[in-house]
Amino acid sequence: RAMLTVRYTLSVKGWSQLDVSDTTIADLCWGQPIDSYLIHDSGPFRLPKFGYSRGFDKVFFLHGHETDHQYYAQDELGGGLKAEDYYEDHVMEKADEILGENVMRPLMNQVECHLKERQYWKSDGDQHAAQIMKEAVRNLERVDRNKSFFMWIDCFDPHEPWDAPSVYDPDLKCPYDPDYEGKDMFLPIQGHVDGLYTDRELEHIRALYAEKVTMVDKWFGHLMNNIRTLGMEDDTLVILVSDHGSPMGKGEHGHGIMRKCRPWPYEELAHIPMIMRGPGLPRNRRVRGFVQSCDVAPTVVDWLGIGVHPSMQGHSLLPLAKGDVEKVREFAIAGYFRYSWSIITEDWSFIHWLKDDEKSVADARFGIYGKDLGESTAHILQMKKANAVEDRDTAFYNRAYEEHKKAATLDGEDQWTCTAAASSEVPARDELYCRKDDPFQLNNVSAKHPEVAKELFEQLKLFMAELRAS
């Protein structure tokens, strides 16, 4: 949302539909000599009534990824594939004991649906990342060279499931863990890892993730090679950016949790890559200045010649990328709507865990994936009931979301994610970390430096108040 709408979202709402008042990059391209494309496989991006494809001239969606995996629910699963073959027995037993049966059920359902899709694959060229990049190339081949174009390629990989090539190809070994002999748990159970996984299992899960990233990198290279072959290299700006990282275990790997199941904006989740390549931009240069998701849209419209509007809260990064300026802001922020705010400076990172009396914006009582998602799918659910097809899984009302919602540890719609075993559990005290001595945020030094913590907290509160006011 922040990438498309040029505005910070942390102070306003979580993952929810676009508002009529939101202005996106595609909206700004309308009426201009610019063709716009959306190529994606992100289920959350196309939730009913969310409107993220709004304004794009051409849209391609590839079925099957998370929250859309029910697309394959009625396919027959052959080849001897079984969901339980991708979880260690002791993990399934402990998950039921520690987290409850409702946690395993939606996960097993998702794995089974994924296997029903995966059984059709012949090579890594059938993976979602490969199909998305090949579709992007097909559209690049057809662009009108007399016009500018804006292409948003939203590739859900390397998001879970981390089904890297070695998982489904018996002739391959994971290049980052070739000697592992256990099961490939490519969709690990979310939650605290203590008592659930062994250290060796966690190591292999991270190796599968690394292999999945390598696969995505290969197919991103396919896109870049075709940009060069098509003669677009000298007049096309390419921005590679992610929306979040992933906790994957103990210590610096994930602060004790697996996957995005707590509203904790630590380094492994909040520090994401942004790589830019384009004519006039120096090569092989790493920029230390802070950038944010809301800088993507101003950068794109600046490049397209539309101009950066004063109401945009983000900044065009072209001056920063060219070396004309050293920075566009003094600090960055991160966090989860309703649960956490974080401020990151050159020397420090500070995390404030919100209390109940601080959650008072208009729709704050509904967490991420809360009220908006429920309302947006309600009409489809009513249609399903009216047609009396209660026994069918194919009447789509985001069954995946409903399954995950049942498994969450919060009641009703007051939950912040549609991930099974997720909870709003947050630490009791705010946290301060020295970025130079402790880049992975493992040693809270707020008691040792209370004056620094107080100063950063005041700065953070002021900035969030300004965002709310604007």
Task: Cite the ranges covered by each PLM segment.
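Catalytic domains that recognize anionic headgroups
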Residues: 1-470
